[in-house]
Amino acid sequence: MIPNMNYQNLKESYLFYNIAQKTKAYLEAHPGAHLYRMGIGDVSLPLCDAVIQKLHEAVEDQAHKTTFHGYMPECGDTELRTTIAAYYQKRGVKLSHEEVFVSSGASDELGDILDLFGKEKTVLIMEPAYPAYVDANVIAGNTIIHIPAGEENGFVPVPDPDIAADVIYICSPNNPTGAVFDREALQAWVDYANKMNAIILFDAAYEAFIEEDDIPHSIFEIPEARTCAIEICSLSKTAGFTGTRCGYTVIPKELFRGGMSLNQMWVRNRTTKTNGVSYLIQKGASAVFTEEGQRQIREGIQIYKKNGKIGRASCRERV
């Protein structure tokens, strides 16, 4: 048996695992110390009341023969998929529920989605970046082109027409810089991707943190993106689902490469590789998109943003 030799090209350990091990060792050596954890973006507030209520209802459903649910649809419950599509409609993005795929979170999807692209692809990653982008492509054996996203370009790179790529990662608001891509910046990347026959993987995990009306929450607010983009989103930061695990992926029906529908390819992938996100989790996730759920999660997000401002000010005082 020949193993996947690409694993030997990975760093010794995943960044956040390494940070966790160092944190554990430090706290064991300094039991009285209090650390502000600024590694992996975990949350500290509990799930909002609307979600908790739905989770309780789902548990009760599972206790009775008439309301018990077994395997869920591999691509997600139709009701939740429709609810998420309606959420996009509020931003002027029209989606069919069949273009929405419920997942167990963005991290899983960011790795699994590479199944659609075959081997030895050229991938653009804007640095600094979420480490999983790099590691997933190293494992897949892809060629990675790192492009800087720093002060010199306002943390928002523009396409280089001399570089040909198959896959482009865009995260907005960006992890870790916080930079956002305005409509003009996204349009430039969409035009580039369509010209190059490339695919944009748009990571929208932090879209709920956007407050400005003129900043796109979704790449599909750029109409031409339907022929070149896949959007991956998570409820981890939106609604504190880091330990509950739920997200969603949007693949338009117009997205074709090599004569094949990537939407239908993903249906085939999910029906092979998953048995669906659990009934309990999807029931809880449905509450996030209700009027009350939206109000409650926004309250939590404001607390996190306030804490971020305090942390930033404290760091500046010590520079």
Q: Where are each of the predicted segments found?
A:
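Residue-level detector of conserved catalytic or cofactor/ligand-binding positions
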Residues: 310-319
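N-terminal small-domain helix-loop-helix segment of the aminotransferase-like
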Residues: 2-105, 112, 288-291
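Helix C-cap/helix->beta junction micro-motif
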Residues: 30, 140, 195-196
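A non-catalytic, amphipathic alpha-helix used as a structural packing/dimerization or gating element
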Residues: 18, 79, 83, 261, ...
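Proline-centered loop/turn at the N-terminus of a beta-strand
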Residues: 34, 122, 143, 166, ...
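Conserved core of the PLP fold type I
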Residues: 66-191, 207-222
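Conserved core segment of the aminotransferase class I/II
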Residues: 55, 221-302
